């Protein structure tokens, strides 16, 4: 970046104007059926010369949609020699730019620009490649309100070199020319809906640049009987190889001309040719006709994103593996078979390297009218809560700075595979989107907490901009502490149901204190109870040397067990007076059967009480209904009697009328 006292930041696409020698010689608007323009593509020298000319020109043309902060001056590129982009993402940002000169404007002033290296550094927020894919799917899911019915994630091929590329396509509302510039720029976001996942207007850039060095976008939009289509290119390869010191985004805009029956360009001739020349040099398509053919399967509205020059891992293999499983996309080298087969095959283990598994739990709710199609096959939606045994529903009302947030319902239970799996964690969603999958809130070395999984939607905490974590706030810390408590409380109350035995910890021997002669022993005050063991036996119940207040303790409204368990939840070896400790896992013991039977009876009793309450409510409703019917019946009786009186009166009138006629 270069700057001085006068700072001018432009978020719109800025297109470098080629030198005279690189300008196309002819121009005319063409429809989709035309062959379009083409440029020489034979050698790296041609590619470099055009790029250098575009980068080192003395003038620039700002894209058609301007903002008050548009940089209306010229641009110059760095004097650094073009260098190929390293194909490994985590090394692609380490090139020497010390020779880069400051961007000079004709009036002698320096302006603040976004350097191409920001594309790479901005994308490093995505440590996990699937997190970047999820960001792109969020854009499609946000389009459900505009009629989107599907999003496609698939492998495609770069026609220029045959290399693998990633395709993401949806049939949402699409983007008009202005929206395309906001998408390619920084800091624009028009997602004001409370249900929208996107917020910062940065996700498209971070996610696409994390998956590959270059991305080309095709979008068609229809509004007020106006049909437009736009093509935009964000190319890290182009910017670095041509030595640009600012981000340059070529964009082509077309509008359908109903009278001519074809698409016409919206930009002026010079601007259009400048943008087209860059697109044909650095995109996967070498002619305008090939570019326009990409709209053939888009339909009247929708967006197609193609990410190419995809990043390699440290073994020089594609970071995303498209070949191992025909209907899935894997992260190369991330499959680790460390545990038993049942653990390795579980969704909590596979989501980290299988995109199909991750997408199945990515959204808490998906409309039946919307489909996620991965490699040609629909992703089946999976609700983790459906995998739980003995589920409990715990209410939690977060509070911070004296204000109360919305009530949160947490579903918690044992995995169906428990106790054979050593998995644990909470799937925490925000506005329907999974932010933290299987978040482990406790560290367990023994059995405590194993197999306990929960699901909740925490809209009261804000996710980080990469949507893979939450901002570290007081609310998040309180939530984490409460989830720790829930885990231990649930485990302590229900572990016998999956085959664990709970034993009381051996009691400590506390000698009886002898009162000094002449001193009267003090008794505890009313409302307190102190228990002291006698003798040397260790089989007596656990004792407490602290007085216990017999007053009912103030419980948290969503508490399900004693508050004593809340003292040291994170420590696996903690003991609490009067509470149980899990010692070992056993099969077939008499005490285990007894405990399980007791818990089952308690659950059955709870169900019966719920049924009784339900029937009582239904009985009351029926009584009210009966009273209403009786009241209506009385009204009908009164009406009937009134009508009978009127009928009798009419009969009398008729009789009198007949007599008068006869006489």
Swiss-Prot record:
GO terms for molecular function: ATP binding; ATP hydrolysis activity; DNA binding; endonuclease activity; protein homodimerization activity; RNA binding. Residues 1-77 are annotated as: Disordered. Stimulated by DMS3. Disruption phenotype: Accumulation of siRNAs and slight reductions of repressive epigenetic modifications (e.g. decreases in DNA methylation and H3K9me2 and increase in H3ac) at target sequences, especially in the shoot apical meristem after rosette leaves development, leading to derepression of silenced-genes. Stochastic silencing phenotype due to randomized RNA-directed DNA methylation (RdDM). Impaired gene silencing due to decondensation of chromocenters leading to the derepression of DNA-methylated genes and transposable elements (TEs); DNA and histone methylation seems normal. It is found in: Nucleus. Pfam families: HATPase_c_3, Morc6_S5. A motif (Nuclear localization signal) lies at residues 552-559. Its EC number is 3.6.-.-. One of its GO terms (biological process) is gene silencing by siRNA-directed DNA methylation. Homodimer and heterodimers with MORC1/CRT1 and MORC2. Interacts directly with SUVH9. Component of an RNA-directed DNA methylation (RdDM) complex that contains at least MORC6, MORC1/CRT1, MORC2, SWI3D and SUVH9. Stimulated by interaction with DMS3. Interacts with IDN2, SWI3B, SWI3C and SWI3D. Involved in RNA-directed DNA methylation (RdDM) as a component of the RdDM machinery and required for gene silencing. Together with SUVH2 and SUVH9, regulates the silencing of some transposable elements (TEs). Exhibits ATPase activity. May also be involved in the regulation of chromatin architecture/condensation to maintain gene silencing. Binds DNA/RNA in a non-specific manner and exhibits endonuclease activity. Probably involved in DNA repair. Positive regulator of defense against the oomycete Hyaloperonospora arabidopsidis (Hpa). This is Protein MICRORCHIDIA 6. It comes from Arabidopsis thaliana.
């Amino acid at each position: 970046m270069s700057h001085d006292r006068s700072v001018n930041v432009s978020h719109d696409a800025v297109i470098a104007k080629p030198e005279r020698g690189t300008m196309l010689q002819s121009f005319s608007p063409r429809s989709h059926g035309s062959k379009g323009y083409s440029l020489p593509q034979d050698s790296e020298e041609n590619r470099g010369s055009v790029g250098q000319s575009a980068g080192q020109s003395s003038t620039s043309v700002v894209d058609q949609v301007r903002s008050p902060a548009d940089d209306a001056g010229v641009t110059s590129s760095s004097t650094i020699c073009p260098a190929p982009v390293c194909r490994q993402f985590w090394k692609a940002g380490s090139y020497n730019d010390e020779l880069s000169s400051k961007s000079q404007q004709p009036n002698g002033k320096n302006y603040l620009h976004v350097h191409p290296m920001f594309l790479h550094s901005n994308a490093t927020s995505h440590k996990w490649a699937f997190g970047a894919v999820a960001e792109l799917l969020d854009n499609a899911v946000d389009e459900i309100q505009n009629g989107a019915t599907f999003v496609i994630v698939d492998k495609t091929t770069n026609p220029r070199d045959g290399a693998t590329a990633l395709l993401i396509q949806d049939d949402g509302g699409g983007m008009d020319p202005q929206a395309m510039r906001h998408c390619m720029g920084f800091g624009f976001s028009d997602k004001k809906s409370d249900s929208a996942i996107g917020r910062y207007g940065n996700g498209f850039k971070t996610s696409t640049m994390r998956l590959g060095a270059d991305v080309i976008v095709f979008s068609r939009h229809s509004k007020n009987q106006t049909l437009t289509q736009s093509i935009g290119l964000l190319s890290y390869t182009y910017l670095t190889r041509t030595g640009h010191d600012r981000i340059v985004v070529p964009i082509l805009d077309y509008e359908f001309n109903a009278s001519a029956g074809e698409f016409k360009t919206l930009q002026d001739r010079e601007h259009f040719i400048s943008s087209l020349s860059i697109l044909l040099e650095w995109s996967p398509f070498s002619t305008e006709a090939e570019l326009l053919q990409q709209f053939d399967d888009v339909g009247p509205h929708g967006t197609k994103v193609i990410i190419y020059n995809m990043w390699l891992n440290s073994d020089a293999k594609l970071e995303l593996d498209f070949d191992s499983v025909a209907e899935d996309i894997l992260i190369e080298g991330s499959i680790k078979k460390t545990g038993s087969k049942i653990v390795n095959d579980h969704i909590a283990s596979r989501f980290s390297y299988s995109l199909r598994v991750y997408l199945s739990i990515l959204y808490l709710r998906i409309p039946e009218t919307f489909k996620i199609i991965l490699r040609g096959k629909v992703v089946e939606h999976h609700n983790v809560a459906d995998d739980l045994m003995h589920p409990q529903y715990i209410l939690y009302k977060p509070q911070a700075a004296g204000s109360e947030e919305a009530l949160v319902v947490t579903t918690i239970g044992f995995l169906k595979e428990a106790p054979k799996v050593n998995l644990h964690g909470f799937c925490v969603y925000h506005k329907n989107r999974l932010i933290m999958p299987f978040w482990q809130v406790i560290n367990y070395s023994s059995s405590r907490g194993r197999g306990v999984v929960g699901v909740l939607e925490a809209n009261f905490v804000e996710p980080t901009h990469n949507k893979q974590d939450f901002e570290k706030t007081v609310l998040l810390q309180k939530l984490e502490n409460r989830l720790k408590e829930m885990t231990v409380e649930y485990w302590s109350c229900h572990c016998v149901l999956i085959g664990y035995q709970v034993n009381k910890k051996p009691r400590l021997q506390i000698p009886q204190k002898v009162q000094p002669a002449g001193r009267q022993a003090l008794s505890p005050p009313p409302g307190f109870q102190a228990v002291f063991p006698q003798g040397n036996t260790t089989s007596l119940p656990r004792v407490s040397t602290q007085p216990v207040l017999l007053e009912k303790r103030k419980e948290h409204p969503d508490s399900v067990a004693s508050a004593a368990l809340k003292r040291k939840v994170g420590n696996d070896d903690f003991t609490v007076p009067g509470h149980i400790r899990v010692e070992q896992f056993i099969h077939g013991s008499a005490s285990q059967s007894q405990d399980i039977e007791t818990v089952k009876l308690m659950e059955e009793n709870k169900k019966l009480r719920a049924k009784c309450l339900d029937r009582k409510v239904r009985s009351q409703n029926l009584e009210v209904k009966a009273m209403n019917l009786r009241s209506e019946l009385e009204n009908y009786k009164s009406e009937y009697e009134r009508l009978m009186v009127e009928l009798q009166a009419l009969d009398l009138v008729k009789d009198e009328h007949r007599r008068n006629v006869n006489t």
